[in-house]
C-alpha cells in the first residue's frame, strides 16, 4: 500500500486508462465522443502509442470476421459444426467497421492509413478436411453475412485465387478453398496512433508516455489512487474509474488492485514468431490472407496462415505463427512477470489447467525445439516452391492466455475476457485473439458494465446512435439492416 495524500484537481480525472494500445485508445475515443469534457488520463509505459501487442509486426493484422478462420466453426463432440462463434465475431467486426466509418465521415480517421481490402481464404488438403470445408461453406453461405463466400476445388480457379501457393503443385493433389473478397488487413499500430492523435490536443485529455503504474488502491469512498513513476517525475493521481488495458501487463495490475474478481485469474504467456518475406517477386504475386487448419491436437493459436500485410505502407508476406516461450507478460516486459503473477489464490488453477492441457504443452515443446529448417518445411505445405533465403524469422508479440478458476477448477481460455469490479469502478481486459478486431464491441461492453447510468441517459444514447446507426438491431437476424450497414461501411471506408 502507499500514502495517497490528497491529489489536487490537476491530478484528478474522470477516467484513467492504463496502456496506450488499441483497447485503451478505443475506449478513450469512445468516451471523448460521448462526453468531450470528461477528464481522461492515458498512461503508457513505452515512449509512444501502439508499440506493444498493437504494433503491426506483433499481431496477425487480420480483421477477424470469421471469413476464413476454421477454429471459429469448431466440430462438436456429436459431429455438429458450430457456427455460433463465427456469427458473433462477424457481427463484432462489423461494429468495428461501423465505428471507423463514423469517424471517417467526421474526418477524424483516414481509412487508407490503417485499412486495406484483402480477400480472406480458407485452404485445406485431403478428403477429410475438404469434406469439413464443404460443410462449413454450406452452413455459412446460406446466411446473408457469408452469402458471398465462394468454394472451389478446381486447380485452375485456385491458380487465379492463390497463384503463389499453387505454383509447383501436382494436378492430382486434393486441395480446396473458400474465399470472401470483402476481407481486410489492418495495421492496428497505425489505427491506435490515429486514435491518440485525435484526442491528444484536447484540453480535457492528458497522455503520459514513459510512465509506469507502480501501484493502485481504492479508498473507502470508492475512488482509485494510482502511483505513477515517470521519466521526469513521480506523482499520485485519482479517478473514479480505471481501465487496465495494458495487454499482458493488465493481469499484474488487476492483482495489485485486490478486487475479489481478480483473484479468479492467472495467466500463461506464449510468444510468437513469423517468417517474413519482403521480396517483390513474391509480394506482388500473393494477395490474400490464407488460413489453413491446425494440426490434430494443436491449439487454435497454432492455425497456420500466409498473409499479405501492409506494415508502415510497405507490402510484405508473413507466415506463421510459430510459438515460443518467454516468461515475460509483455514483449518489453520482465522475465519475472510469470513468477510474480503466481499467488496462493491461483496456483492450484494453474496446475490443474496444465494437467488438462497436455496437448498444448507438447505443442509448445515441439515449437521450442524447431529449427529454421523445420519452419521452412512447414511453410512448404503452403509454398512448395519456396526460396528459403527470401524468408527471415521475426519475433512477434506476447499473448497471455487466461486461466480462470471456475466451479470445474482451473480452465484455460483462448479468447478475451472483461473483468470488472462489483461497483463498476475498475475494468480490466485479459486474453488474446480475436482481440483488436473486436475492440469496439469489447469497449462498449465496458461502458455498459461500468458507466450504466450514463449509457442510459438520452445524451449518450443519441450519441451512440450517431456513432453506431445499427445499434439495437441484431444484424445477424435482420438481413436488410445488415446489408444497409455494410453498404454504408464500405462506402465510407472505401472498401468497395
Swiss-Prot record:
Enzyme Commission code(s) on record: 1.1.5.4
What the entry lists under InterPro entries is as follows: FAD/NAD-bd_sf, MQO
Highest rank taxon of the organism: Bacteria
The GO biological-process annotations, alphabetized, read as: tricarboxylic acid cycle
The molecular function terms in GO held by this entry are: 2-hydroxyglutarate dehydrogenase activity; L-malate dehydrogenase (quinone) activity
The top EC class, named as a word, is: oxidoreductase
Pathway membership of this protein? Carbohydrate metabolism; tricarboxylic acid cycle; oxaloacetate from (S)-malate (quinone route): step 1/1
What is the catalytic activity of this protein?
Answer: (S)-malate + a quinone = a quinol + oxaloacetate
What is this protein identified as?
Probable malate:quinone oxidoreductase
Per the UniProt record, the source organism is Prochlorococcus marinus (strain NATL2A)
Amino acid at each position: 500500500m502507499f500514502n495517497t495524500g490528497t491529489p489536487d484537481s490537476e491530478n484528478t480525472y474522470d477516467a484513467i486508462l492504463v496502456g496506450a494500445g488499441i483497447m485503451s485508445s478505443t475506449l478513450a475515443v469512445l468516451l471523448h465522443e460521448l462526453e468531450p469534457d470528461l477528464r481522461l488520463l492515458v498512461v503508457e509505459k513505452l515512449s509512444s502509442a501502439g508499440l506493444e501487442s498493437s504494433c503491426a509486426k506483433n499481431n496477425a493484422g487480420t480483421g477477424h470476421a470469421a471469413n476464413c478462420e476454421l477454429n471459429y466453426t469448431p466440430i462438436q463432440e456429436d459431429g455438429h459444426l458450430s457456427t455460433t462463434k463465427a456469427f458473433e465475431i462477424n457481427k463484432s467486426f462489423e461494429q468495428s467497421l461501423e465505428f471507423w466509418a463514423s469517424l471517417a465521415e467526421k474526418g477524424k480517421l483516414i481509412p487508407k492509413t490503417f485499412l486495406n481490402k484483402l480477400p480472406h481464404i480458407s485452404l485445406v488438403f485431403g478428403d477429410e478436411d475438404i469434406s469439413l470445408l464443404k460443410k462449413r461453406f454450406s452452413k455459412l453461405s446460406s446466411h446473408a453475412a457469408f452469402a458471398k463466400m465462394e468454394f472451389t476445388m478446381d486447380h485452375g480457379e485456385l491458380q487465379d485465387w492463390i497463384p503463389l501457393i499453387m505454383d509447383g503443385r501436382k494436378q492430382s493433389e486434393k486441395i480446396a478453398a473458400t474465399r470472401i473478397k470483402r476481407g481486410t488487413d489492418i495495421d492496428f499500430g497505425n489505427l491506435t496512433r490515429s486514435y491518440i492523435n485525435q484526442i491528444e490536443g484536447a484540453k480535457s485529455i492528458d497522455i503520459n508516455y514513459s510512465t509506469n503504474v507502480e501501484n493502485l488502491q481504492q479508498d473507502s469512498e470508492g475512488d482509485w489512487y494510482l502511483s505513477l513513476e515517470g521519466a521526469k517525475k513521480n506523482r499520485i493521481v485519482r479517478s473514479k474509474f480505471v481501465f487496465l488495458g495494458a495487454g499482458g501487463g493488465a493481469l499484474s495490475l488487476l492483482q495489485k488492485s485486490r478486487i475479489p474478481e481478480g483473484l479468479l485469474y492467472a495467466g500463461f504467456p506464449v510468444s510468437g514468431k513469423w517468417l517474413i518475406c519482403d521480396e517483390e517477386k513474391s509480394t506482388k504475386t500473393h494477395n490474400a490472407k490464407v488460413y489453413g487448419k491446425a494440426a490434430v491436437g494443436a491449439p487454435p493459436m497454432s492455425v497456420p496462415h500466409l498473409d499479405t500485410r501492409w506494415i508502415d505502407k510497405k507490402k510484405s508476406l508473413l507466415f506463421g505463427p510459430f510459438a515460443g516461450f518467454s516468461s515475460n507478460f509483455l514483449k518489453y516486459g520482465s522475465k519475472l512477470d510469470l513468477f510474480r503473477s503466481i499467488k496462493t489464490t491461483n496456483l492450484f488453477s494453474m496446475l490443474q489447467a496444465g494437467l488438462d492441457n497436455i496437448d498444448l504443452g507438447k505443442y509448445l515443446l515441439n515449437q521450442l525445439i524447431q529449427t529454421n529448417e523445420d519452419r521452412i518445411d512447414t511453410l512448404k505445405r503452403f509454398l512448395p516452391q519456396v526460396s528459403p533465403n527470401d524468408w527471415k524469422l521475426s519475433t512477434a508479440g506476447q499473448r497471455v492466455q487466461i486461466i480462470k478458476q471456475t466451479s470445474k477448477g482451473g480452465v484455460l481460455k483462448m479468447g478475451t475476457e472483461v473483468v470488472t469490479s462489483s461497483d463498476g469502478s475498475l475494468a480490466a481486459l485479459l486474453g488474446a485473439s480475436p482481440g483488436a478486431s473486436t475492440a469496439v464491441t469489447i469497449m462498449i461492453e465496458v461502458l455498459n458494465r461500468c458507466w450504466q447510468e450514463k449509457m442510459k441517459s438520452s445524451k449518450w444514447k443519441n450519441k451512440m446512435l450517431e456513432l453506431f446507426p445499427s445499434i439495437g438491431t441484431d444484424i445477424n437476424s435482420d438481413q436488410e439492416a445488415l446489408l444497409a450497414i455494410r453498404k454504408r461501411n464500405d462506402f465510407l471506408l472505401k472498401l468497395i
